[in-house]
C-alpha cells in the first residue's frame, strides 16, 4: 500500500548511511523530536516502522522542522552538520518561515540538501506503485533558496529511481567515513500517510556522523 511504500523509501535511505548517527524528527502542524542521534539504525528503523499512529491534519511545518533539526545539531562539531530535507516543498503550517529557518541553519553551521518529490498534481512512482500526490505543485524555487543559502544542493525526484540516484550523489557529497556530524531527512509522524497521498507532507531525518 502507499504507506508501506513510503516507509520503504525511507528505510532504504537509512541502509545507505551505515556509520552515521541517525535521529528522527516528526512533524505535521508542528515538529517533534522522535529519537536522539544514534548509531543504532535498527532502533531507528523500528521507530520508522511505528511512526504513523494518526493524522495531524493536512499541514506541513517545513520551517519549524528545519529549526528543530538545527537545534539538535548545535552540540555537534562545526563543519559536519548536514540536513537532508525530503519534502513536497509546500509550507502550510508552523510559526517559522522556511527562508528564515534556512538562515538560522546557515548561521549555526548547518548545510541543507533539499530533495523535492512528487507534487505537480500528478503521481509519484514508488516500487511500481503510482501514488497520487494531490494538486499542489512543489515549491522548487523555495527549496533551491533553502539549499543555496546554507551551502547545500537542491535535487528533484519524481520516482524511486531518481531518489536512488540522489541518495548516491548525497552519499558522495557527505561520505560516511568522514569525521563529524550530519543531519539526514527528518520524518514526520502523523501526516506521513497524508503526505504521500496528498503531496503536502514533509519527510526528514536527522543524522549525525560517527567520530
Residue ranges and their predicted role:
Residues 11-12, 31-33, 91-93, 120-122, ...:
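Short beta-strands and strand-coil junctions in structured, solvent-facing domains, enriched
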Residues 157-189:
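Juxtamembrane amphipathic/hinge helix adjacent to a transmembrane helix
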Residues 25-28, 86-89, 115-118, 157-160:
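Active-site-proximal beta-strand/loop segments in catalytic clefts of secreted hydrolases
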Residues 1-80, 95:
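Membrane-embedded segments
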Residues 57-60, 80-82, 89-149, 167:
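VWA/integrin I-like adhesion module and closely mimicked acidic/polar interface patches used
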Residues 176-211:
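C-terminal signal-anchor/stop-transfer transmembrane helix together with its immediate cytosolic
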Residues 44, 69, 84, 112, ...:
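Residue-level signature of catalytic and energy-coupling elements of molecular machines
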Residues 44, 154-155:
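Scaffold/interface architecture of coatomer-like assemblies
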